[in-house]
Design a protein with these regions (language model features):
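Short aromatic/hydrophobic contact patches that present stacked aromatics
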Residues: 1, 62-66
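Conserved PLP cofactor-binding pocket of PLP-dependent enzymes
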Residues: 15-51, 57-63, 91-93
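Feature detects long, helix-prone N-terminal segments enriched in hydrophobes
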Residues: 57-58, 69-76, 91
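Short, conserved charged micro-motifs
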Residues: 7-15, 71-77
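Conserved glycine-rich beta-strand-loop-beta hairpin in the small C-terminal domain of fold type I
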Residues: 1-3, 35
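Hydrophobic "lid"/C-terminal helical patch
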Residues: 83
Length: 93
């Protein structure tokens, strides 16, 4: 998750995702943080009476990376390097 209070001026989640993608590493926004909003929960009684603020916050700050068993160590290393490089810029004071 991208913590808003730790971002440098001019950086937001979309800019972070774009910068990681520009380095050739697939990166996306989103999560299933507010899954209770899905149609499958209509009429079940399982949906909370009010939106859950932490779930909403996580949904608006999350980033996603490809994770699957066919990734090579080199691909994982490239991903980690790109994340570190971008986050160093995105959190600089």
């Amino acid at each position: 998750y991208v913590r808003p209070e730790q971002r440098a001026a001019g950086w937001n989640r979309d800019r972070i995702v774009a910068a990681i993608n520009a380095l050739g590493v697939p990166c996306y926004q989103g999560s299933c943080s507010e899954v209770y909003m899905e149609k499958a929960f209509d009429g079940t009684g399982w949906r909370p009476a009010a939106p859950l603020p932490t779930a909403h916050a996580l949904g608006t700050t999350s980033v996603m990376f490809l994770v699957h068993p066919t990734l090579t160590q080199a691909e994982v290393d490239t991903t980690c390097t790109a994340i570190a490089q971008v986050m160093q810029q995105a959190t600089a004071a």
